[in-house]
Amino acid sequence: MTLSSTTRTATPPPAPDYDEIVNVIQLYIDGFNQADIRKFRQGFHENAWWACTVPDGSLVQHPVEESLEEWVGDGFVKDWEHQILSVTQAGDVASVVLEMHSAAEGPATGWVDIHALLRIDGVWKDMNKTATHVSRAGWAATAGA
């Protein structure tokens, strides 16, 4: 059986607000590396959520606000390196695909995130972070190598 579709795939133009969108992602990275809860709160919407699949495929999910103390705590990695793999914007909505890993531990222990952002009252806010361990990330797993 052959399936046909009238759906077309369009290549999006460059994101007009690329710098502003990437700045939100930089706040996310800086929040970890500088253990600065204010940076997280500046970048994430107050009702943002995160979800991820860990190496065994299990799902973990929480409101971002409930995770901030752990993220800035002494036991959390503080040497994240990252690479933005894509930025797509359609008006007031944007997505960023991000590869990140510990400099000390290397790319094999990293994560691939998709961040969903909204422009609210002229300000970009990260509404949702969905991630997977690089061992489950397909082509994006080698981006940081």
What are these model-derived regions, one by one?
Residues 20-23, 49-108:
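Surface-exposed, charged secondary-structure patches
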